[in-house]
Amino acid sequence: GCNDVLEDGFTDGDNDGLLGNSPVTVDSLGVVTSGSDGYTDPIDGDNNGVRDYKEVGAQVDLVSNPTSMTISEQLIAFFVASGSTTAGTMVYQWQESTDGGTTWIDLVESVTYVGVDNDTLKIINAQLEISTYKYRIVISSPAFVCDVDVYSDPAEIIVLADNDKDEIADVDDLDDDNDGIYDTEEDTTDIDGDGIINSFDLDSDGDGCNDVLEAGFTDGDSDGLLG
Protein backbone atom coordinates (compact mmCIF):
# COMPACT_ATOMS: atom_id res chain seq x y z
CA GLY A 1 0.00 0.00 0.00
CA CYS A 2 3.01 2.30 -0.06
CA ASN A 3 4.46 3.11 -3.47
CA ASP A 4 8.13 2.37 -4.14
CA VAL A 5 8.88 5.95 -5.16
CA LEU A 6 8.03 7.09 -1.63
CA GLU A 7 9.78 4.18 0.08
CA ASP A 8 12.88 5.03 -1.96
CA GLY A 9 12.81 8.49 -0.40
CA PHE A 10 11.86 10.28 -3.61
CA THR A 11 9.17 12.85 -4.44
CA ASP A 12 5.73 12.01 -5.83
CA GLY A 13 3.76 15.24 -5.63
CA ASP A 14 0.50 13.87 -7.03
CA ASN A 15 0.77 10.48 -5.33
CA ASP A 16 0.39 8.45 -8.53
CA GLY A 17 3.39 6.23 -7.88
CA LEU A 18 5.54 7.97 -10.50
CA LEU A 19 8.55 10.16 -9.85
CA GLY A 20 7.59 13.83 -9.67
CA ASN A 21 4.29 15.18 -10.97
CA SER A 22 2.49 13.91 -14.05
CA PRO A 23 2.72 14.16 -16.96
CA VAL A 24 6.11 12.44 -16.70
CA THR A 25 8.82 13.17 -19.25
CA VAL A 26 11.80 10.93 -19.91
CA ASP A 27 15.04 11.11 -21.86
CA SER A 28 16.20 8.73 -24.59
CA LEU A 29 17.27 6.19 -21.98
CA GLY A 30 13.93 6.24 -20.21
CA VAL A 31 15.21 8.24 -17.23
CA VAL A 32 12.58 10.54 -15.77
CA THR A 33 13.58 14.15 -16.30
CA SER A 34 10.47 15.85 -14.98
CA GLY A 35 11.12 14.92 -11.34
CA SER A 36 13.08 16.94 -8.83
CA ASP A 37 14.97 13.95 -7.45
CA GLY A 38 15.41 10.21 -7.92
CA TYR A 39 18.15 7.83 -9.01
CA THR A 40 20.08 7.95 -5.75
CA ASP A 41 20.48 5.10 -3.27
CA PRO A 42 17.05 4.05 -1.99
CA ILE A 43 16.67 4.42 1.75
CA ASP A 44 16.87 1.71 4.39
CA GLY A 45 15.07 3.36 7.27
CA ASP A 46 15.64 0.63 9.84
CA ASN A 47 19.23 -0.08 8.73
CA ASN A 48 18.65 -3.81 8.40
CA GLY A 49 20.33 -4.12 5.02
CA VAL A 50 17.07 -4.33 3.06
CA ARG A 51 15.92 -1.36 1.00
CA ASP A 52 12.53 -0.18 2.23
CA TYR A 53 10.87 -0.63 -1.16
CA LYS A 54 11.76 -4.34 -0.98
CA GLU A 55 10.59 -4.74 2.62
CA VAL A 56 6.98 -5.18 3.65
CA GLY A 57 5.93 -2.50 6.10
CA ALA A 58 2.77 -1.84 8.07
CA GLN A 59 1.12 0.84 10.15
CA VAL A 60 1.91 0.68 13.87
CA ASP A 61 -0.87 0.49 16.44
CA LEU A 62 -0.98 1.66 20.03
CA VAL A 63 -1.53 -1.21 22.47
CA SER A 64 -1.27 0.49 25.87
CA ASN A 65 -1.01 4.01 27.29
CA PRO A 66 1.23 5.15 30.15
CA THR A 67 -0.38 5.64 33.54
CA SER A 68 -0.12 8.80 35.65
CA MET A 69 1.67 8.39 38.94
CA THR A 70 2.38 10.12 42.22
CA ILE A 71 5.69 9.60 44.03
CA SER A 72 7.82 11.17 46.73
CA GLU A 73 10.70 13.34 45.59
CA GLN A 74 14.02 11.69 44.72
CA LEU A 75 12.40 8.33 43.94
CA ILE A 76 12.17 6.63 40.53
CA ALA A 77 9.11 7.07 38.32
CA PHE A 78 8.15 4.55 35.65
CA PHE A 79 6.00 5.11 32.57
CA VAL A 80 5.18 2.15 30.33
CA ALA A 81 3.49 2.08 26.92
CA SER A 82 3.56 -0.31 23.98
CA GLY A 83 2.68 -0.69 20.33
CA SER A 84 2.40 -3.41 17.73
CA THR A 85 2.82 -3.88 14.00
CA THR A 86 2.24 -6.77 11.63
CA ALA A 87 5.45 -6.14 9.70
CA GLY A 88 8.72 -4.29 10.07
CA THR A 89 10.15 -2.68 13.16
CA MET A 90 8.93 -0.02 15.56
CA VAL A 91 10.73 2.98 17.00
CA TYR A 92 9.78 4.46 20.37
CA GLN A 93 10.39 8.05 21.42
CA TRP A 94 9.28 9.48 24.76
CA GLN A 95 8.31 13.14 24.94
CA GLU A 96 7.84 15.61 27.78
CA SER A 97 5.52 18.58 28.17
CA THR A 98 6.18 21.22 30.80
CA ASP A 99 3.11 23.32 29.96
CA GLY A 100 0.23 20.94 30.49
CA GLY A 101 0.41 19.26 27.09
CA THR A 102 0.49 22.31 24.81
CA THR A 103 4.02 21.73 23.53
CA TRP A 104 6.14 18.59 23.51
CA ILE A 105 9.88 17.92 23.22
CA ASP A 106 11.72 14.68 22.55
CA LEU A 107 13.58 13.43 25.60
CA VAL A 108 17.29 12.64 25.33
CA GLU A 109 18.90 9.77 27.22
CA SER A 110 20.58 11.05 30.38
CA VAL A 111 21.20 10.20 34.03
CA THR A 112 17.69 11.50 34.76
CA TYR A 113 15.76 10.10 31.80
CA VAL A 114 16.52 6.45 31.05
CA GLY A 115 14.91 4.43 28.27
CA VAL A 116 13.75 7.35 26.13
CA ASP A 117 13.74 5.10 23.05
CA ASN A 118 12.04 1.98 24.41
CA ASP A 119 8.68 1.10 25.91
CA THR A 120 9.61 1.94 29.51
CA LEU A 121 10.72 5.41 30.60
CA LYS A 122 12.43 5.78 33.97
CA ILE A 123 12.79 9.15 35.65
CA ILE A 124 15.63 8.83 38.14
CA ASN A 125 15.76 10.95 41.30
CA ALA A 126 12.52 12.78 40.48
CA GLN A 127 12.57 16.38 41.68
CA LEU A 128 9.73 18.63 42.82
CA GLU A 129 10.32 20.88 39.81
CA ILE A 130 8.88 18.30 37.39
CA SER A 131 5.63 17.84 39.30
CA THR A 132 2.63 18.16 36.90
CA TYR A 133 4.86 17.53 33.85
CA LYS A 134 3.31 15.19 31.29
CA TYR A 135 4.86 12.33 29.34
CA ARG A 136 3.79 10.46 26.21
CA ILE A 137 5.30 8.04 23.73
CA VAL A 138 5.49 8.37 19.93
CA ILE A 139 5.65 5.11 17.98
CA SER A 140 6.66 4.93 14.33
CA SER A 141 7.86 2.46 11.72
CA PRO A 142 11.17 3.61 10.18
CA ALA A 143 10.94 1.19 7.25
CA PHE A 144 7.39 2.22 6.30
CA VAL A 145 7.40 5.82 5.13
CA CYS A 146 3.64 5.79 4.57
CA ASP A 147 2.87 5.14 8.22
CA VAL A 148 1.29 7.70 10.54
CA ASP A 149 3.09 8.20 13.84
CA VAL A 150 1.03 7.02 16.80
CA TYR A 151 0.88 9.10 19.99
CA SER A 152 -0.14 7.72 23.35
CA ASP A 153 -2.36 9.54 25.78
CA PRO A 154 -0.30 11.72 28.12
CA ALA A 155 0.47 10.63 31.67
CA GLU A 156 1.15 13.11 34.46
CA ILE A 157 3.71 12.90 37.22
CA ILE A 158 3.00 14.37 40.65
CA VAL A 159 6.05 14.69 42.89
CA LEU A 160 5.38 15.15 46.59
CA ALA A 161 7.73 16.88 49.02
CA ASP A 162 9.68 14.67 51.43
CA ASN A 163 11.59 16.85 53.88
CA ASP A 164 13.49 14.06 55.64
CA LYS A 165 14.02 12.01 52.45
CA ASP A 166 12.74 8.83 54.09
CA GLU A 167 10.68 7.96 50.98
CA ILE A 168 7.44 8.87 52.76
CA ALA A 169 5.89 12.08 51.46
CA ASP A 170 5.35 14.81 54.04
CA VAL A 171 1.61 14.63 53.49
CA ASP A 172 1.70 11.02 54.76
CA ASP A 173 4.67 11.22 57.14
CA LEU A 174 3.83 11.50 60.84
CA ASP A 175 7.32 12.81 61.60
CA ASP A 176 8.63 15.00 58.78
CA ASP A 177 12.09 15.56 60.26
CA ASN A 178 12.67 12.17 61.95
CA ASP A 179 13.43 13.72 65.31
CA GLY A 180 11.03 11.41 67.16
CA ILE A 181 8.43 14.11 67.76
CA TYR A 182 5.10 13.86 65.96
CA ASP A 183 4.32 16.66 63.52
CA THR A 184 1.04 17.24 65.34
CA GLU A 185 3.08 18.12 68.42
CA GLU A 186 5.62 20.31 66.61
CA ASP A 187 2.98 21.96 64.35
CA THR A 188 3.67 24.21 61.36
CA THR A 189 4.55 27.44 63.14
CA ASP A 190 8.11 28.79 63.27
CA ILE A 191 9.01 29.46 66.88
CA ASP A 192 12.54 30.77 66.28
CA GLY A 193 11.68 32.69 63.11
CA ASP A 194 14.42 31.07 61.04
CA GLY A 195 12.12 30.36 58.11
CA ILE A 196 11.86 26.65 58.87
CA ILE A 197 8.58 25.38 60.29
CA ASN A 198 8.86 23.47 63.55
CA SER A 199 7.96 20.10 62.05
CA PHE A 200 10.94 20.47 59.66
CA ASP A 201 13.30 22.18 62.11
CA LEU A 202 15.65 19.98 64.16
CA ASP A 203 16.10 22.87 66.60
CA SER A 204 12.70 24.53 66.70
CA ASP A 205 13.52 27.11 69.36
CA GLY A 206 16.98 27.95 68.00
CA ASP A 207 18.74 27.49 71.33
CA GLY A 208 21.48 25.23 69.97
CA CYS A 209 20.07 22.08 71.51
CA ASN A 210 18.30 19.73 69.13
CA ASP A 211 14.63 18.95 69.68
CA VAL A 212 15.26 15.20 69.91
CA LEU A 213 17.38 15.73 73.03
CA GLU A 214 15.08 18.34 74.52
CA ALA A 215 12.23 15.87 74.11
CA GLY A 216 14.18 13.37 76.22
CA PHE A 217 15.00 10.97 73.39
CA THR A 218 18.25 9.37 72.22
CA ASP A 219 20.50 10.76 69.48
CA GLY A 220 23.64 8.66 69.53
CA ASP A 221 25.41 10.45 66.69
CA SER A 222 24.22 13.97 67.50
CA ASP A 223 22.72 14.56 64.07
CA GLY A 224 19.38 15.76 65.38
CA LEU A 225 17.61 12.56 64.32
CA LEU A 226 16.15 9.95 66.61
CA GLY A 227 18.53 7.07 67.33
Write out the residue ranges for each language-model feature:
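Extracellular calcium-associated, cysteine-rich motifs in secreted modular proteins
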Residues: 1-60, 146, 157-227
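Surface-exposed, proline-enriched loop/turn segments that connect beta strands in immunoglobulin-like
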Residues: 63-68
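A short beta-strand segment in extracellular, disulfide-stabilized domains
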Residues: 75-83
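Core motif of extracellular immunoglobulin-like domains
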Residues: 81, 94-95, 135-137
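Solvent-exposed loop segments of extracellular immunoglobulin-like
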Residues: 85-93
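Surface-exposed, flexible coil segments in extracellular/virion-facing regions
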Residues: 98-125
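Solvent-exposed loop/turn motifs of extracellular immunoglobulin-like beta-sandwich domains
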Residues: 127-134
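Short, solvent-exposed loop/turn segments at the edges of extracellular beta-sandwich modules
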Residues: 140-148
